[in-house]
Amino acid sequence: MSITPQEALTRCIEHREIFHDEMLHLMRLIMRGEMSPVMAAALTMGLRVKKETIGEIAAAATVMREFATKVDVPAEVSDHFVDIVGTGGDGANTFNISTASMFVAAAAGARIAKHGGRGVSSKSGSADVLEALGVNIMLTPEQVAESIETAGIGFMFAPNHHPAMKNVAPIRKELGVRTIFNILGPLTNPAGAPNILMGVFHPDLVGIQVRVMQRLGAKHAVVVYGKDGMDEVSLGAATLVGELKDGVVTEYEIHPEDFGLQMVSNRSLKVADADESKAMLIEALENKPGTPREIVSLNAGAALYAANIAGSIGDGMKLAREAIASGAARAKLDELVRVTNQFKA
């Protein structure tokens, strides 16, 4: 049975859940532009105030995936295939740690399908820093698949893969606050990577997002929240982890000291723009001693664990350090620049 947007809004006001099939229907109305902007804005805020449930988020993500422009990756390259992504919105304004980690993880044997956009809540989104590094981000789905096959990394610029989001973009911009769409981005990888390292902006989302990934059929998901507020594995505090492996969800806490690292503030990782982020990212890839290199090694280690290349985050970190020290991580950046620019007309 379908539900009207007004009925759904009443449910939110009464703090009652919207059921799976109802959420599918409502989300399809939004994606097709068949719900008025006023109603769509009211409903997204109603969900936010009520607090979105695992079922509501999973249903909304299912619809976003339906409407996405997919990237078809050959089965033979789907082993160790992983997405490294953050929800953003952590307000930390650090350099692009997950983007730097992507080069390291790929150099150590992972296949990366990274899905991102321009900075909204941050000074530099993944698209901004990749452009500053010389990567061509305007690829067709076929070119992204080829980039994954040849360079081990494919970057999917979110607006190219979610055309239906044009119906939501003005609402999100005018509201200017976090909505369910901030949570959905990392759940809707157009290449369908079965494994994921996901950073989230709130501790409650660790348990929620990992269970959403479980419902969406992920194989290995590692969801992290640094207790200093970072949507990464942090060096400045303990990190909460929600992990889905072999169909089972576990939640635990990790600390920098577990990996032989000192706890240090993330203050030294802050940047003002994409150019500063680029400089710090290159420092880390070029093995310059310091906090950027350490946090990239740690997060790349977590990505290698999520990709089932390493048996633990600690083992993954050792592989990440080797990839940086050997120059392979820096070479991977140069390779991605070369491969993506070959596609320019």
UniProtKB/Swiss-Prot annotation:
Details of cofactor binding: Binds 2 magnesium ions per monomer.
Pfam families documented for this protein: Glycos_trans_3N, Glycos_transf_3
UniProt-annotated binding residues for Mg(2+) 2: 231-232
Catalysed transformations (reactions): N-(5-phospho-beta-D-ribosyl)anthranilate + diphosphate = 5-phospho-alpha-D-ribose 1-diphosphate + anthranilate
EC assignment: 2.4.2.18
Annotated disulfide bonds: none
Binding site for 5-phospho-alpha-D-ribose 1-diphosphate: 86, 89-90, 94, 96-99, 114-122, 126
GO cellular component term of the entry, any: cytosol
Cofactor(s) it depends on: Mg(2+)
Positions annotated to bind anthranilate 1: 86
InterPro entries: Anthranilate_Pribosyl_Tfrase, Glycosyl_Trfase_fam3, Glycosyl_Trfase_fam3_N_dom, Glycosyl_Trfase_fam3_N_dom_sf, Nuc_phospho_transferase
Annotated binding of Mg(2+) 1, by residue: 98, 232
Domain of life (superkingdom): Bacteria
Positions that bind anthranilate 2: 172
Role summary: Catalyzes the transfer of the phosphoribosyl group of 5-phosphorylribose-1-pyrophosphate (PRPP) to anthranilate to yield N-(5'-phosphoribosyl)-anthranilate (PRA).
Assembly and oligomerization: Homodimer.
Protein name: Anthranilate phosphoribosyltransferase
Gene that produces this protein: trpD
